[in-house]
Amino acid sequence: MNFEGKLLGQDLKIGIVVSRFNDFITGRLLDGAKDVLVRHEVESEKIDVAFVPGAFEIPLAAKKLAETGKYDAVITLGCVIRGATSHYDYVCNEVAKGVSKVSDTTGLPVIFGVLTTETIEQAVERAGTKAGNKGAEAAMAAIEMANLLKSI
């Protein structure tokens, strides 16, 4: 038997956690995610957004949303751009581990849509220009995974 997640958002409720840090990028990621969700028939009233100060706070907010039992998937959006110190490496690693852990412990699809880039230019490219919109891609993954888990 094959299981496959359909790309129809009808009847899905989606939570989104967005970092305010680098909001000139994360705002574009959020717009891309919401656009894809609505285009795939997720009702706008069934999309909830939680804003957090920075990427490091994303896993905790994602966990709280997941634990409510209200959502079929949670999308995490943020942008970490390398600076002159090792702070970037710690933040990227901890956010990725934290988001993965939330998904593993709750059994809910928690989609990693956090950009980890070397430069501002790379972030801009991934937020709706040359390299597409990673927020939109995260929304597609959320719809597919939510439906896949419903079919298993």
UniProtKB/Swiss-Prot annotation:
Source taxon at top rank: Bacteria
GO cellular component, one term: cytosol
Listed CDD domains: Lumazine_synthase-I
Pathway: Cofactor biosynthesis; riboflavin biosynthesis; riboflavin from 2-hydroxy-3-oxobutyl phosphate and 5-amino-6-(D-ribitylamino)uracil: step 1/2
Pfam families linked to this entry: DMRL_synthase
Cited HAMAP family: Lumazine_synth
Similarity remark: Belongs to the DMRL synthase family.
Name of this protein: 6,7-dimethyl-8-ribityllumazine synthase
Species per Swiss-Prot/TrEMBL record: Staphylococcus carnosus (strain TM300)
Gene symbol of the encoding locus: ribH
